Amino acid sequence: MSSSLPLILYIHGFNSSPQSRKCQELGEYLKTQKIPCDYVVPELDQWPGENAQMLYALASEALASRPVYIIGSSLGGYYATWLMERLLEDNPHYPVKLVPINPAVKPYELFEDYLGPQKNYYNGTEYELTHEHIEQLKHLEVPALHRPDNILLLAQTGDETLDYRKAVVRYQDCPQRIDEGGDHGFQGFEETIPVILSFFSPLLIPKI
């Protein structure tokens, strides 16, 4: 990766992967529009604690020389919110921004209904979701958002998996775009990419 271009870090959701639709659409858009950035989509492990350590190491190293712009989808939005706050603990002036997309607000509560065998159908990984996973997620909850102006919430009212109203309250001090209808996968994501990039930086807006 370049050491000077902005880093766009995409954090995927529960049992998802870098091969998911939004990850691929964003990567293709950045490539075809020749957006001056580096794009990274880490493949998350089943363990929240390990994911948090990996994401923090990646982002903190990048912030030594360039801005970091984070996108988090569903459970990835929960990770991303923790990550941004953790980075701001190191330096409250770090150039970091966040766009959570249909984010999970308290995923540890939802996971009570998913305890037991799980399978990631993208990579075939099978594992057991346990109370230890839930406890690790609880440790990543942050009580307050210290740079709300640097967070843009994207949510759709038709989300069939998560209650969008909880995200509206969680990110109430942040800029928000709430679309009527849609679904958990966030319909029309590709058309929303320019909105995300312009929020991150004018330098990332596609040239006409």
PLM feature spans:
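Eukaryotic N-terminal low-complexity, Ser/Thr- and Lys/Arg-rich leader segments
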Residues: 1-3, 207-208
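Gly/Ala-rich beta-loop-alpha elbow adjacent to hydrolase catalytic centers
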Residues: 71-81
